[in-house]
Amino acid sequence: MAHARTTYFHNTVGGYHGAKPHRMQALYDYHLSKTISPNVVNMLNIKYTLQTAEDGSLTAGVNPSAFGNVWLVEEIISCSSADDEIQRLASEDLLRKALTTDNISQNQFALDSLSQISLVSHKANELKYRTTVSSTSFAVFSEMYYPHGWKSFINGEEVSHYRVNYALRGLLIPAGTHEILFRFEPDVIARGSRIRLAGYGIFSLIVLLFFVPLKRFGLKQ
């Protein structure tokens, strides 16, 4: 109940429900349950923590090292397996490097003082970012990777994104100034909408075919 109450007002790692996606649950169990990994806390952009004082009261602690909603990395490290990836989260410099088992065409990136990326709007089903980079870059987003519905777009054109750091999203960005959009558009919902629209069309056609002849018949009478 406490988790649900907190989640009503704030984004929380635990979420509002005990059931979590498999990788998020594994991440929680491996790095946030018994032993807390600062690296994982920071990449999940955990800005505040609740700490129990000696008298049993709760106090809020601020984490100044949180990475933010999104950041650019200099290197992508290829991991041999998901187990290798989740284990290395505790030791790698995740602010500069991203871990993955995906096949990404480029793994080294040059960053300069002009390269930047930031979140500009946030909705439950849509995230919008603005970025300016001098050369091809790679961004890590502090959002769960979920391929069954989340689609990514650069300047309105759909592009592929990747799973990095075991459970987060990553995206290759071409040089220049761009608008990046993540939108939740599950194919099953799109199919349902098309079927519903087709149903409306068929129903309308039946109405026309049934009532128009009746109207003409009435006029003849």
List PLM regions with ranges:
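Conserved luminal/periplasmic juxtamembrane motif of membrane-embedded glycan-processing enzymes
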Residues: 1-130, 136-143, 150
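Active-site-proximal, structured, solvent-exposed surfaces of multi-pass membrane proteins
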Residues: 47, 96-220
